[in-house]
């Protein structure tokens, strides 16, 4: 059973407070200030993008044992973060705990212990077969972190995600059109309001479970109109039915005033996406098995962001591509 959609103010008022909110706000403020004062392409501050990645959970109990999850490995967000960094962006990586991370995509999926060997002197070292990949991952990651270009903020629940997104958006708003949102996270459409949620583990002895779900407030329009009105905004539309994909993408473009919608099908999202703007639709396909589709996506988005900055500031900035 589905209840009517809540308004954003009611959602935030009833949500459990974000842990370490003051510390997160301080880190965000420092990150934005440092990169806003840094020289970017064409002068001025560095471009700043918030990449959201992974799926949100919907707890069924306040002391959560059971939850509803959203499908997302976080691979697209992690890969896109790497290419944004290569393009000269500072990246706030808002990610699901345990999802795919930047620079870790090519590490083996096997047990962590398989990365290592113990030599004759009982010293632990990276296994020779994994050494090149691990060395590159560590080097690239450390460069981004130590350079101050990458800030990672984790979430698990829908409550954490939306509170963090609001904090990030209101911080990025100071960057004006140099700010970007790349909203690749799989966000829950329905949830159990905190004040109507069971406090303890739901017991199975009572028979079938009937649960009333509320619609998660649509935050895209709030982000676009209130939190960061000058930022360049990209949302994603994932569907399983090809017949409604473009229709849904067009609706998101018009209803939420997105600059671009990246449309993809569950069956082919790793090989193909459609870039939808108010002027055109462009299909991007993976050229070969060793190429990242995200490389092409970020190239196109960076070029469109440059045009947006030019139109917003009357000071044209060249894309790094």
From Swiss-Prot:
<comment type="function">
    <text>Catalyzes the first step in the biosynthesis of coenzyme A from vitamin B5, where cysteine is conjugated to 4'-phosphopantothenate to form 4-phosphopantothenoylcysteine.</text>
</comment>
<comment type="subunit">
    <text>Homodimer.</text>
</comment>
<dbReference type="GO" id="GO:0005634">
    <property type="term" value="C:nucleus"/>
</dbReference>
<dbReference type="GO" id="GO:0005737">
    <property type="term" value="C:cytoplasm"/>
</dbReference>
<keyword id="KW-0436">Ligase</keyword>
<dbReference type="InterPro" id="IPR035929">
    <property type="entry name" value="CoaB-like_sf"/>
</dbReference>
<protein>
    <recommendedName>
        <fullName>Phosphopantothenate--cysteine ligase 1</fullName>
        <ecNumber>6.3.2.5</ecNumber>
    </recommendedName>
</protein>
<dbReference type="Pfam" id="PF04127">
    <property type="entry name" value="DFP"/>
</dbReference>
<dbReference type="InterPro" id="IPR007085">
    <property type="entry name" value="DNA/pantothenate-metab_flavo_C"/>
</dbReference>
<comment type="pathway">
    <text>Cofactor biosynthesis; coenzyme A biosynthesis; CoA from (R)-pantothenate: step 2/5.</text>
</comment>
<dbReference type="GO" id="GO:0015937">
    <property type="term" value="P:coenzyme A biosynthetic process"/>
</dbReference>
<keyword id="KW-0173">Coenzyme A biosynthesis</keyword>
<dbReference type="GO" id="GO:0004632">
    <property type="term" value="F:phosphopantothenate--cysteine ligase activity"/>
</dbReference>
<comment type="similarity">
    <text>Belongs to the PPC synthetase family.</text>
</comment>
């Amino acid at each position: 059973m589905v209840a009517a959609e809540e308004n954003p103010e009611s959602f935030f008022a009833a949500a459990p407070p974000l842990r370490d909110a003051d510390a997160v706000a301080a880190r965000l403020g420092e990150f934005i200030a440092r990169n806003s004062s840094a020289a970017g392409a064409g002068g001025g501050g560095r471009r700043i993008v918030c990449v959201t990645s992974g799926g949100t959970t919907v707890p069924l109990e306040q002391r959560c044992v059971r939850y509803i999850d959203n499908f997302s490995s976080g691979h697209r967000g992690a890969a896109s973060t790497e290419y944004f960094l290569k393009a000269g962006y500072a990246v706030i990586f808002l990610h699901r705990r345990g999802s795919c991370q930047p620079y870790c995509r090519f590490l083996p999926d096997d047990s962590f212990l398989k990365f290592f060997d113990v030599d004759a002197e009982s010293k632990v070292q990276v296994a020779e077969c994994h050494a090149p990949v691990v060395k590159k991952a560590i080097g690239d990651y450390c460069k981004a972190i130590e350079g101050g270009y990458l800030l990672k903020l984790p979430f698990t629940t829908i409550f954490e995600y939306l509170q963090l997104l609001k904090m990030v958006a209101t911080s990025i708003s100071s960057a004006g059109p140099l700010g970007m949102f790349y909203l690749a996270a799989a966000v829950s459409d329905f949830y159990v309001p905190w004040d109507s949620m069971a406090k303890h583990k739901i017991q199975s002895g009572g028979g079938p479970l009937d649960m009333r779900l509320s619609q998660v407030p649509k935050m895209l329009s709030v982000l676009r109109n209130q939190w960061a009105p000058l930022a360049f905004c990209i949302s994603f539309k994932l569907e399983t039915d090809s017949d409604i994909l473009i229709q849904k993408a067009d609706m998101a473009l018009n209803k939420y005033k997105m600059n671009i919608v990246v449309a993809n099908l569950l069956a082919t999202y790793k090989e193909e996406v459609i870039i939808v703007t108010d002027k055109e639709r462009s299909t991007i396909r993976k050229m070969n098995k060793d190429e990242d589709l995200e490389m092409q996506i970020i190239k196109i988005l960076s070029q469109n962001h440059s045009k947006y900055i030019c139109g917003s500031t009357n000071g044209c900035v060249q894309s790094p591509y």
